[in-house]
Amino acid sequence: MANVKVTLKDGSVKEVAAGTTLLEVAKGLSQKLGKQALLAVVDGVNKDLTDKLEHDASVEFVVPESSEGLHAIRHTAAHIMAQAIQHLFPDTKFAIGPAIANGFYYDLDIEHLFFPEDLIAIEKEIAKIVKANLPLVRSELPRSEALKMFADKDEKYKVELINDLPEDAVISTYTQGDFTDLCAGPHCPSTGRVKAFKLQSIAGAYWRGDEKNKMLQRIYGTAFPSKEELDAYLHMLEEAARRDHRKLGKELDLFSIMEEGPGFPFFHPNGMVIRNELINYWREVHRRYGYQEIKTPMILSRKLWETSGHWDHYRENMYVTEIDNEDYAIKPMNCPGGMLVYKTHPHSYRELPIRAGELGLVHRHELSGALHGLFRVRCFTQDDAHIFMMPSQIKDEIQNVIRLFDEVYATFGLKYHAELSTRPEDSMGDAETWETTTNALKSAMEDFGLDYVINEGDGAFYGPKIDFHLTDSIGRTWQCGTIQLDMLLPEKFDLTYTGEDGLKHRPVMIHRVVYGSIERFIGILIENYAGAFPAWLAPCQVRVMPITDKHYEYAKKLSDEMFKLGLRVYLDDRNEKIGYKIREAQLQKVPYMLVIGDKEVEDGTVAVRRRGEGDIGAMKQEDFIAMLQEEIADKK
């Protein structure tokens, strides 16, 4: 039998007999790899380990620690859960059961209504199936045979899925023990590879997401390569629930979402303090980095949105009105207005770069089911900036933006990583321009010392972009900042500048946001800090608490002095026990509490309690004020 050449990830080449399975190749490399491998990527395509090599190929084995490995574990876990449900509830009809970002689910058609106690029983059955270590066997069937098999089982959803496949589609099933499911795969070699799992919740879901179809029951779960990783993830979920910005937003009286305005946040006085501090900081930083601030109207003519392309490509997300018998739209983006500001007068190369920032309120229609606190809303303030420049200035400007982003995120203690998205298939512009601009982004990041990963073909059709993903205090990532090169809008709006040669030239433009959305960024900060904001952001920075009425005058004078200095101080002069006052201040996550009793009045001091630490001792009034002012100024 002829041999085939296998090119491995490290570039080495191994010869094996044609017809050798991928699992055999893995075992031939090492017993450890043979035990760990879940899948193999053959010439860029994920394959089961039972697949045979019939020709030369590049092969990379997928292990549990990789993202592909985790996806395979969760995909297989969905099948195991379905098998367990079939054992316990034989009348169940199965719809779809994919792996998703943080786990898996299966949509089920069954008269029995699932309750949390059912999940416990299903988990026990899953454990039996995992322990049995059943092999998952792939089969490819003719369409007619596949249709008959699932029709005989009265699996109408599978029949519908098969009928929707193209005539030339490969139809495959996976069998583990007594359970067979329609699936393209690939899967783990056996059920025993799913080492740690947890069923999490029950929800409703319309078949194919269409409310005209039947409502099915959906069971969510997750799976990990080890119990330690599962436990860490479940702990993170518990911590995330404790930090939920919707819960804390209510407890700390920051914002609310009313039924009279779903998706339109109401900010309360405490929330406005945080919002205004973020805006003040944004303005201070941008002034230092050479930005000018503009403001464009919220409602603009349909003609503008036709020029920008939004009317044709974004119309379903826009709120439209009629004024003087003409169509207008509430802006979903700030960019077109920024183009009009640039065009108000001619520009010379000597003026470039022009950095124009805008804190613009935009409105976008979101389906009600997608709304989520401050994270997914219908109106938000986007901290846009548009930078107009010559091609020769791209690299320097990108670095300038990265430097600004780095400073801002460091202020909040947020680490980040960058992702570069490159030219998609449906791009505009020529290959040379794309290569030049993409290389400028790469060079800017590399010279700055910024590590990045590349998302091939994931850029916008009008230019490459860099996305900044922030990591919060419990390890979750949030995409916030974006640097987007745009070769389309300057063309559409016929933007020009006069070059050194006296001729008209087209400027290059960068869109960029650092917060992304102020509302969403506030939500992220609430959860990152668990509501315990640093002093510079805290709605109330210090509470002054006299123990009895005889300490009131001293406390009042101190409070007034701090108020005059611009500190956010609250005098708690209620007729309550001091322990109660302290407890309430702790629940409100106030950074500092000043307790005033006989000794403090006599000595001209304050008894200082710091959030999270408790009593830190007595201080002179002026020393405490100086300490707090320094902490606020340093944004600690």
Tell me the role of every PLM-derived stretch:
Residues 1-75, 80-93, 100-101, 107-636:
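NTP/phosphate- and nucleic-acid-binding module
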